[in-house]
Amino acid sequence: MMELMVVHPHIFWLSLGGLLLAAEMLGGNGYLLWSGVAAVITGLVVWLVPLGWEWQGVMFAILTLLAAWLWWKWLSRRVREQKHSDSHLNQRGQQLIGRRFVLESPLVNGRGHMRVGDSSWPVSASEDLGAGTHVEVIAIEGITLHIRAVSS
């Protein structure tokens, strides 16, 4: 086996790359992906240009770091370009700020509930508001929406 790796080192690198990529598909957290890609590229280069084992190891290490760095740069650019509303993906209340609704039930002492889609949200206002009042969500505190009356 060792003789085969010495005579045909590209087979070792291509096999290692395939194993790392297969393990990445099983695990799926990204740690082995770039090492697998670097091993495949190293195998292809060694197949075309015979290199000593020292240079093969250096090339593998550099390609792994380069691939991971390029992925990090691409991913950080994508995160920066993400729409602002996506940053509140798990904060539904934040998405409601600025939206307008009609109260179905009156607010007593400035407190009550308002239907938003298929859910009911606790609301508070600076004044009592009657049913049928057009309101706008101006802020959220915890799960309570702060609203104000607006003209329709």
Curated annotation (Swiss-Prot):
Intracellular or extracellular location(s): Cell inner membrane
Taxonomy, superkingdom: Bacteria
Its membrane topology: Multi-pass membrane protein
Keywords tagged on the record: Cell inner membrane, Cell membrane, Membrane, Transmembrane, Transmembrane helix
One GO cellular component term noted in the UniProt record for this chain: plasma membrane
TM ranges: 1-21, 32-52, 55-75
Periplasmic compartment residues: 53-54
Location (main, coarse): membrane
Pfam families: NfeD (PF01957)
InterPro entries assigned to the protein according to its UniProt record, in alphabetical order: Membrane_assoc_protease (IPR052165), NA-bd_OB-fold (IPR012340), NfeD-like_C (IPR002810)
Gene3D superfamilies: Nucleic acid-binding proteins (2.40.50.140)
Cytoplasmic side: 22-31, 76-152
Annotated family: To M.jannaschii MJ0826.
Record's protein name: Inner membrane protein YbbJ
Organism: Escherichia coli (strain K12)
